Regions:
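Peripheral, non-AAA+ core regions of ATP-driven protein-machinery
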Residues: 1-111
Length: 111
């Protein structure tokens, strides 16, 4: 199931729209694509650990996370919350009907 979440990349005081797309399908592994820097790539481990500590399960399937547009560099930890919500919604663990109505950014702790 494909989930789209709106967030933003901050450039100075300007917010440039970014879309986090999360898809869960047959296969294995977690893949992050879309010109993410090291901090964004590290967010996967932080996000997975935070979800597990809150009692959510990580599907034993292939999870693809795309940060669009693909031609724009993304940096920072503000993508943690959109990625986490995308995994929760795409795996069917919660119904999040208002997800598409808000721009979401935020960092997660491990707990």
């Amino acid at each position: 199931m494909l989930i789209n979440i709106s967030c933003a990349k901050c450039i100075g005081i300007k917010a440039v729209p970014v879309r986090v797309e999360v898809d869960i399908a047959t296969g294995i592994g977690i893949h992050l694509v879309g010109l993410a820097d090291a901090a964004v790539k590290e967010s996967l481990l932080r996000t997975i650990t935070a979800l597990q500590s809150m009692g959510f399960r990580i599907p034993g399937k292939k999870i693809v996370i795309n940060l669009a547009p693909a031609d724009m560099h993304k940096k920072g930890s503000g993508y943690d919350v959109p990625i986490a919500l995308g995994i929760i919604a795409a795996s069917g663990q919660r119904d999040l009907p208002l997800l598409g109505k808000y721009m979401i950014m935020g960092e997660l702790g491990l707990d």
